[in-house]
Amino acid sequence: MTNARSASFVATLVAATFLMGSSFVAGKILIDAGYPPMVLVGWRFIVAALATLPLAAWREGGLRQALLPAGLQWRDVAIAFAIGLFQTAGVMTLLFYAMRSISASSAAILLFTNPIWVALLGRVFLGDHLHAARIVGLVIGIVGVALALGGKISGIGFGEAIGLGSALSWTVSTIINKKTRTHFGVWALTFWQMLIGAIVVLAVAYASGQHWPAHTTPANWWWFFYLAVPASTGSFGLWFVALARGGATRTSSYLFLAPLFAVVCSYFVLHSSLSGIQFLGGALIGLSIWLVNSEPARDRPAAD
């Protein structure tokens, strides 16, 4: 990458991970207000999907051309369905069931082990280079996430296994998105995967007896639309843009920033305490990103 493209790539990922991290705060506020998690997730992504339509139409020269592009094949539909199933429905549903038996912090730590699985599977399925510094960086990043969230994680049980499943579901989606190509543009693919995932989650939610609360305050509507549009449409769209520009391993390494932003946003919005160990976690996250993005000496271009 040129310096300008590299800076744009980093800015895109920082914006995406900030929006991801802030979504935990918005979600926490709404869940504490009594909103069933799966109903909240489902309607969040219905609204988020609809919010992508103007962007898809603008990028592709019309809504029909964006959603049903020329040359569309059943293979494209299958890929969009798979990404929606794994990235929206799979990740969020597994995360919800994990948090029934483990803390939100433990579930978040397990979810954000995603980069290490992307790095390992990316080596197998994508041919991404996995040098020693990158491996060390990924491990340090996992430790940094644990510290940034307060180091709260206990033994491995059923809940932890489900939480790990959410990370693996995200990993599968990342690999599919990077390995395959469709006729859909970035925003059209974002629309379809969020819509498909939302429908699956809502079907499960209503089948299990969950319902939207009878009364919603203006403040809660504000938090819901923030969760649905900037924190979902924005973060997912920027995430796909970044994946298209960089390798899966390098892109996913920046996911370590999302829980750090969640901690910082919680401090300012929810007035949660921020300990010294959490600051140490942030420093380790920064170190991990530097290591994962470093190139071994033999791969660096020779100086002129």
Regions found by a protein language model. Name each.
Residues G21, V25, L53, G84-A89, ...:
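Hydrophobic/small/kink-forming positions within alpha-helical transmembrane segments
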Residues W43, T88, M92, S106-T113, ...:
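Helix-helix packing/entry segments at the starts of transmembrane helices
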Residues D76-A82, L130-G141, E160-G163, F184-M194:
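Cytoplasmic-side transmembrane-helix entry/capping segments in multi-pass membrane proteins
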Residues M1-W43, A48, Y97, K152-K179, ...:
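Glycine-/small-residue-enriched transmembrane alpha-helix faces in small-molecule transporters
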Residues T52, L121, L130-G150, A167, ...:
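Hydrophobic transmembrane alpha-helices of multi-pass small-molecule transport proteins
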Residues R5-V10, A33-G42, A70-V77, G150-S169, ...:
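Juxtamembrane helix-entry segments on the extracytoplasmic side of multipass membrane proteins
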Residues L30, L40, R44, A98, ...:
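Hydrophobic/aromatic residues within transmembrane alpha-helices
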Residues L19, S23-F24, L53-L111, L147, ...:
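Specific transmembrane alpha-helical segments of multi-pass solute transporters/efflux pumps
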